[in-house]
Amino acid sequence: MAPAATAAAPRLLRAALLLLLLVAAGRRAAGAPVVNELRCQCLQTLQGIHLKNIQSVKVTTPGPHCDQTEVIASLKTGQEVCLNPTAPVVKKIIDKMLNKASAN
């Protein structure tokens, strides 16, 4: 082999090993779950909203992302608002939405 080819061999080997390491790390990360948000979504809440304006309600229980119960209402206008889960009006809304869903 020529001296130039011999000097390039370690660099080529190093580049190939680095590429192999990156490919292996990428495959391992591909199977990991993806978490969208690691914080609470509701920074401000409403005490209530009229039931006729609500399309659906999503209740998120406390977990690693947030230590509070979150109630997110999707309105018929397409907007989403956060509701105070401890407000009496919100508790009634959740009960009505659950009863409506179980009746269907």
Swiss-Prot record:
Q: Entry's Pfam families?
A: IL8
Q: List GO molecular-function terms, semicolon-separated.
A: chemokine activity; growth factor activity
Q: What is its main location?
A: secreted
- Source species, domain of life: Eukaryota
Tell me which positions the record assigns to the signal sequence: 1-31
Family under the similarity heading: Belongs to the intercrine alpha (chemokine CxC) family.
Supply the name of the protein: Growth-regulated protein homolog
Record carries keyword Signal: yes
Where does this one sit in the cell?
A: Secreted
Q: Does the keyword Manganese apply?
A: no
Q: Which Gene3D superfamilies match?
A: 2.40.50.40
Q: Which GO terms describe its biological process?
A: immune response; inflammatory response
SMART domains cross-referenced by the UniProt entry: SCY
Keywords of the record: Cytokine, Disulfide bond, Growth factor, Inflammatory response, Secreted, Signal
Family matches, as InterPro entries: Chemokine_b/g/d, Chemokine_CXC, Chemokine_CXC_CS, Chemokine_IL8-like_dom, CXC_Chemokine_domain, Interleukin_8-like_sf
Cysteines joined through disulfide linkages:
40-66, 42-82
Quick one: a GO cellular component term?
Answer: extracellular space
Q: What does the protein in this record do? A: Plays a role in monocyte adhesion to the endothelium.
- Taxonomic lineage of the native organism: Eukaryota, Metazoa, Chordata, Craniata, Vertebrata
